[in-house]
Structures are given as C-alpha cells and as structure tokens.
Amino acid sequence: MATPAPLSALNRAIRENDLVEVTRQLGPEPGMRAVEFAPGLSRWQWEATAARVVNPFGFVRGGYLSVFAGALIDSAIGTALAEGELATTAEMKISYIKPAKPGVLQGEGRIVQKGSRVAFVEARISNAQGDLVASVTSTWTVMRAD
C-alpha cells in the first residue's frame, strides 16, 4: 500500500471526487477502485479474481469482503468530514447474505446519520448480477483534529 497522504489531502481528494488519488490511498487490494463520490456516498468496484481472495470452496473470502467494505465506509465518512474533523471506526458488523463468486463486485457506502461526535454508516456489496452478497453497518466516533 502507498504511504498515506496527509489526512487533509485525502479528504480534499474525496471532496473533489479525485477517484485516482482516493483509489491509490484507500484501495487496499489490487482490483479495487473508486467509482463515484457524492456527499454521504461512495461507490467502488472490485475485480475479485486473485487466487488469494478465493477460499477452497471457490468463493471470495469473507475477510476480503470486509476489507472492501472498509474502503466503502471509510470513503463515505470522508465525504462528510468538515475541515479539521477526524473519524475512527467504533464498531463494524458485516452480514454475509450470499456467497460471492470470483468476479466483479459493486459496493456502495452511505452515511445514515452524522452528528458532531457519532456517525452511522452502512455499506452494501453486490455481485455483477445485482444480488446482495454482504451488508455492513458501522458506528464511527467523530472528533476534532486538535
């Protein structure tokens, strides 16, 4: 993974919809790429075909789906942070709905509610046919970067 940019630079890239820079910073696995950002929303795509991401039964490993979910929720919260705000995950729950076969996966992260101290973010991961394969809810602690 690349050396992280200063947080303000990463937040600026998210706000400016700089998909290449955000993918470089937050795309922790080859094949993951940012597709779209809007206030409170992030969309990513992942070509989950590398042998290491597939379990012995032929499905994408849950841990890798969790990493993909992390990119979705990280960038969704990043779209809503004001200058000087930071956020960290307080809790994350992932429910695996349907086994994910290797191939293209789509993901969407969305802010449910953001206050001055707590934010609630959700993500959905679907296969190329549009079937839901994982649902994620997360709670974030929001703080000032003092």
Predicted regions and their residues:
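Terminal targeting signals and extreme-terminal segments of soluble enzymes
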Residues: 1-146
